[in-house]
Amino acid sequence: MFTNQDFEIFNDQTLAGRMHLIKTVIDPKFEQVAPTIITSLQTPGEPPFYAHVAKHLRRFKNPPVDTWVAFSQNKRSYKAWPHFELGLWPDRLFIYFDILDECKPAVQAKMQLADLTPLLKALPAGYVISNNHGVPATQLATPANITQAIKKFNQYKHSELVVGRAVLVGDPLFENADTLNKLIIATFKQLLSIYQPVMAAVSAERQA
């Protein structure tokens, strides 16, 4: 499972070097944990989830600033669908549910994101929220921050919704693989309550 040493891949400032470390150190861990996560997300009678390990194919000069595996009910892609992500920034491991820019129009066509407010506010302490998946910074998912994040999502064209948990480098959880794995699974299961109505809305829009 993930350890504090995994974050050392970001010390390599070259594209080739960091990509090699991602492929040989991090990606095998994503592939190892993916089946367990997929099983935890699966709902009887619903389409299966698929794991999408980031390939960083558009990187030609600068090394990736983060890396991840996404979980989507679309076999070919994930960015245009509500999805989950498990990944690493240089300072944290993240466990998130995402509505990215590519998915936003379909969500807004069929639902009011404010309808998710009660579900978001019911999240346990320690969850975080953001309007930009492309930066590591987040805010605690307090009622006030949730309200503000939903407002930004609705007001600004390229504003996204990211919510979940983050485990910072140096956290004792990285010394206990079993406990960390349980936290990852528990977080994704908790986020399912938010994912499901959003996915239903997007599916309805795509089938219209």
Swiss-Prot record:
Q: Gene3D superfamilies per the record? A: Protein of unknown function DUF1054
Q: Which InterPro entries match?
A: UPF0637, UPF0637_domain_sf
Give the record's family classification. Belongs to the UPF0637 family.
Q: What is this protein called?
A: UPF0637 protein lp_2332
Species per Swiss-Prot/TrEMBL record: Lactiplantibacillus plantarum (strain ATCC BAA-793 / NCIMB 8826 / WCFS1)
